[in-house]
Amino acid sequence: MSPPKNLKKFERPEVTPRRNISLLSNRLADAGGWRIREDVLERDYCLAWFLAALSQSDLKPILGFKGGAALKRCYFGDDRFSEDLDFTLLEAIPMEEILRWLHAVYREVLDSSGITVAFDREDRHKHVNSYTFYLRYTGPLPTGSDAKVDITVREQVVFPLAERPILRGYDEFVDVPENRLIQVYSLEEIAAEKTIALFDRARNEPRDLYDL
């Protein structure tokens, strides 16, 4: 039996050209005198797509987006580049369940952008109060890379979470949707966490001061 004539075959979009990443790197260098590496810009682009897909998944109501990446992606959209994504678990769910639900997120990213994202490995260090693992992604550049995801299991959130759109960040990321909402920590909550982190000698992250 042949398919209906008006049924269109699904065509997966191609990944945004590497040229777009190169043009963005050149534009930022011309504007500020500092060239951002293409692999850093690619990570920013791929993580934007991951968050956009996450916002449409069953994980949206149980994860609170936080940290420096949340400041950039949901509040300011500036040139603050993160190597990881931080969340807080809002419901008691085992890591295995989260990893299973993430398969739908990977599929959405691939079908909508052509970017390949997949679970890579758990963090080699033991974490008492967090699920920490790495994602492997392949985007516009020929070689893939990874990004760290840290999900705090138990944390007292003082201020109400906000539901905010995921910012595209740059005009060159034209295919990243901007009308998708995600649960994110309030500015007050993020500022409080960053202030506490400044006094944590074991942490030693200069970005905490920059974010404030």
Outline where the language-model segments fall:
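Catalytic cores of NTP-dependent nucleotidyl/adenyl transfer enzymes across multiple folds
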Residues: 2, 26-34, 44, 48-52, ...
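Short histidine-centered catalytic/ligand-binding loop motif
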Residues: 35-36, 86-95, 198
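Active-site nucleotide-donor binding segment shared across nucleotidyl transfer reactions
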Residues: 55-85, 91
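Metal-dependent nucleotidyltransferase catalytic core
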Residues: 89-125
